[in-house]
């Protein structure tokens, strides 16, 4: 996934009134305001699944994997992938994510307040603190995860989880 692809996708969603926040590697690069590595996909957090599907279908995107109510992947014929994480916002603005194995993950409302840049364009993204929290739970880190999380620590002073110090 190239920076131009990210901007094309975000622009299409903005024009359709679909609000998304970057997550994953592109969110790290967005808050750092520089692309630090290649990206296989675009991770997003959103509430409006139907709007997402309607906005991106004309661009050739369709669901290729996952469950629409929680986490799914959109793909196109060019091999671009969007990993969508669906939240429902509570009255306090927290994003409630239904985990596939049961249970809920709560994205705190303050975690949706970050703005970063991709290819000079302003984009919504999860805050560095919430990005670190997301990486702290649920899976073993790859070398790329270490690189991303260390970059957040070095730039923003966000503490690495104890298991990864």
Residue map of PLM features:
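Compositionally biased terminal segments of proteins
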Residues: 1-165
């Amino acid at each position: 996934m190239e920076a131009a692809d990210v901007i094309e996708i975000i622009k299409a969603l903005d024009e359709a009134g679909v609000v998304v926040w970057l997550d994953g590697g592109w969110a790290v690069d967005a808050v750092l305001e520089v692309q630090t590595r290649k990206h296989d996909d675009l991770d997003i957090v959103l509430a409006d699944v139907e709007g997402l599907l309607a906005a991106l279908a004309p661009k050739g995107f369709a669901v290729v994997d996952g469950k629409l109510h929680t986490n799914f992947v959109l793909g196109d014929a060019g091999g671009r992938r969007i990993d969508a994480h669906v939240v429902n916002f509570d009255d306090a603005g927290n994003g409630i994510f239904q985990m596939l194995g049961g249970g809920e993950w709560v994205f705190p409302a303050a975690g949706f307040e970050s703005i970063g840049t991709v290819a000079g364009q302003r984009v919504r993204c999860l805050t560095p603190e919430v990005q670190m929290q997301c990486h702290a739970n649920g899976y073993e880190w790859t070398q790329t995860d270490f690189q991303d999380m260390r970059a957040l620590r070095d730039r923003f002073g966000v503490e690495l989880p104890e298991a990864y110090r």
